[in-house]
Each structure stands twice: as structure tokens, then as C-alpha cells.
């Protein structure tokens, strides 16, 4: 039976489209959903438990509070839902595993001599992006194929440096050396256009263009260029031969199928362009236990194409999608042309889906073999923590905190993040202590916690600070824990789960409990906590030592008249360290911009 507060929240829900957020007693968002009519959708959860699926029953039993956001349409609600799931990664939502940093290929069309390289973020900077790819390995393979076919430059300057002779890349046939004039601007632009067509799956157009360029080069007796075009044609034909499918397909389409075991689903996507398979990717989905097949695929389609740079006119799926009409409308708007979603239930689409599904099953099998021991251990650890600490759910997100200083100098704090038992280094954050003087670790912890949670509900919070942790781990005992608990209470976060892990006896302290919890030394839960604690310590210490090192460099150079911040940075950049500057010859010092003979002599004398 919902609490009176929850019943009032449900009763006050509007009959508008929008997004609803369900929170547990700790204030953690555990589910995000969208609805054409908010009131009707949310009320459908609060029926007799016997009418609910087991997973939904567990969700409803955890709901303590509701929030909602009204949108102008169901399509707007879909986009907002996607952004909130990506930001908060709620425990009960189906979600792409590790979706925060999928790699893309970027073509820098905003540069005179464009490059093609791997990136994990997209910007509105005039570049062209392809992806996302499921792994760094797959995007590196694609980049390697492109490099061998088109030999574009890979130097990491926006403008290639003028050189008198080509570099090693040219000698090993990996670059056409625009920096030495070995290729004209027009020919280089042709090359990049061919690479784009290739990535779009239009290899037949590339072949026609290359054949034309080969014949033109041969006619003007430019046999070196003609031979290059011939080799490119041969290589592309080899690639095309490997793209034939057993099933007969035509046109441009993506085919999507999945295989499931427990809470993990492996989704396989085949990218078909002009009747040929130009690529395939595998993605892991979490939170799929007891979900309907059509719902699982709907969630994948939403989350994948939300960040995809290429949307085909046709998408074939293994099962009918629960949100097909709204997804078609949304994808058509994103593509700028009609998108049709169909289920491959018979005929040629079914033959194609069967192949994709077989690949998904094989990928799931390989993933299970690879991750069996580690995944089982992490699951055991999280479930053991839930039981030992009395948490409502296994702690999906654990944040670890530590302080590092020497008698109050160069004091820093660290925050490390583990999700589902694995470190999420992109979310790590470090804090330089600003308000505390002297060696007062308790006050330093208070500052770090205040700054971290002060960003919680800000628009610019970023992914590191936007979500509340399921569990906070403090490196220390009762004193450190009490200090942090006091700060959390002051911030209105009384329900936040927090523990201290004391290093001497590896005892776990909980707020309000006089006796610590002691776990067995071989306990997966204790080993996970130790790893989080040690990682927070390592991250804080590394930052502290880095600041000390820079402080030492600064003080040594500050004693030299004429060396200000700009020259100091330039010297360190050129020679790497004070030791490197000390060992530099007078002539080497004079090569540094802004260093004249008198200043160089002063540096040599004073160092």
C-alpha cells in the first residue's frame, strides 16, 4: 500500500504527456519512464501485486517518492526520458552498458587537409562523425582499413607542418605526404570524399570514381598515380567480397536482434548498405531480466540511435517494438526523411534476422565465458554488501573519498566511482582544498563532501556529480564517518548511505552503530570495498604528489630574475623539468623563445 504522501502525489498527477521519476527512500532515482498520459501510466503500477511482473513488484516496493516533468508531446517525453536514463542510469531501467564513452570516427572537414581519427565526443565544429562503435577494437580496425585504402595524413596538427622530405609514414605507404607537396589539395580532397563514401557504404561509387581517376592518370602518363588507384580498387574489391550475406538483402537497412541470459542481453546490429554488410557491432544491455522482448528492443533502438550519426530508411528488428509509431516519428525527424521499422517475422527479413540473432547468441556465449568468474564475483560482492549493510538494493554506484596532505600543505581530496563493481575513471574527480588551514582531515572531508553534493542538482553538474551514489565509502573510522555524516545531514541528505572503512583491522563503521561490522578476509564484499578505498587513496596521493612536484619546480625557477609565468611554462615544456633545464647547454637555452644571452647566463648560474 503506497504511503499517504505517495498517494497524494499520484492523485495530483496531470493528464499530460511527460516523464516520471521514481525514487527510493535514499532519494536515489531507481526508474525513469515516459507516458502519453502521466496519470494513467503511473497509476498502472499501483495495482494488486499479483497483477505485476516480479521485477515491477520489486520496483514498486522500493518507491518512496515521485517526480514528474510535463512535455509538449510524447516525442519530447521520449527525448527527455533518454537523457535522464543516460544521466542517472537507474537500477530498474534497461540501459546500454558503459554507454558514456562509445568511440566515433571523426573527419576534420573544417581543416584544410582533413584527418580521420578516433574520438569519444562529438562537437558542432564542422567535422563529420561516424558511429558509435561498440568498442575501441572495432573502430581501430575500421580506421586501419581506411588508412590502408586512402593514405590520409595522421599527424596531429590542424595544419601539416611544412617539411623538406617526407616522414616515415610516407616511406611505409601510410601517407601521401601533403606536407611536402607529394599530393595536390584537389587530389587530397578527392581522397577524403572517397573515404566518406566508403564509410557510408557506397563502395560502388568509390570504385567508379577510382577507375575514372586511374584512366585519367594513365592517359597523362602518370603511371605512379595510376598504380595507386589500381591498388585501391583491388583492396576495396577484397573488402566487398567479405561483405556478402547468406541471406539476400537489398537497399539500406539496419537489422537488430538480441540474445538474453538473466539480466544481461547482447544486441547485434548489422549495417547493410546497397545490399552489402558494411559492418556489425555488438552491445551489452543491463537490466533486461523479466522484460518483454519488444520492450528490450525498443529501449535499445532509443538509446542507440540517440547517439548514432547514421540512421537508415529501414530498421528490421527481431520482434515488434512496443513504441514503434513514436520511434518511427522521432527517427524520421532525426534523419530528415522517412524511417520504417518492421519486425522480421517472415520471408527475406526473417532469414536476415535469423543470421543476426545467431551472431547475437554467439556473442553472448563468448561474453559469458570471458566474464563468468569476474561477473559472478562482483555480483556476489554487491549482493553481500546489500545484506551486510542493510541496503534496499545492491549498491550500483559506490563513491570512495580520501584526503591527502603533509601537515596541511598541498591538501587535496579525491572522489572515485565504481558502478556495478567496476571503476568508472571518467567520473573520478579531485578537489584542491580551499577553506581549511593546517592538518585537519575532518574539516577537509567536510569541504570535499559539501562541494561534491553542492553540484548535485545544478544544470552544469556533469555526469560525475549529477547522480547520488548508492553508497559512499570514506577512508577512515568513526571520526571521519561522523564528520561526513554531519555534513550530509546539514545538506538535507539524511538518508544517504555512507560507511567508513578503517585500515588497521579492515572494520566497517556505520552511522549510529557503536560496533563495527567485520567481514571475512576472503569476502568478495570486503575485497570490493578495499579496492574502492585503495583507489581513492591512490588517486588522492597522485594528485597531491603532482601538486608538490609543480610547487617544487615553481619555487626553483621563481628565484631567477626575468623568469615569469610564461617563460617558466615554456622552459618546463621544452626541457621537461628543472633537472632538464639545469643540464641544458647555453645554446639550447638560447633556442627557447624569450631567452636572451643575459637571461640564459642567469639561469645557468642560479641553477
Curated annotation (Swiss-Prot):
Interacts with UvrB in an incision complex. Signal peptide: none annotated. It comes from the Bacteria. It is found in: Cytoplasm. It holds the Pfam family UvrC_RNaseH_dom. Keywords: Cytoplasm, DNA damage, DNA excision, DNA repair, Excision nuclease, SOS response. The UvrABC repair system catalyzes the recognition and processing of DNA lesions. UvrC both incises the 5' and 3' sides of the lesion. The N-terminal half is responsible for the 3' incision and the C-terminal half is responsible for the 5' incision. One of its GO terms (cellular component) is cytoplasm. PANTHER family: UVRABC SYSTEM PROTEIN C, UVRC/OXIDOREDUCTASE. GO terms for biological process: nucleotide-excision repair; SOS response. This is UvrABC system protein C. The keyword Endoplasmic reticulum does not apply. The keyword Magnesium does not apply. Belongs to the UvrC family. GO terms for molecular function: DNA binding; excinuclease ABC activity. Residues 204-239 form the UVR domain. Its main location: cytoplasm. Residues 15-94 form the GIY-YIG domain.
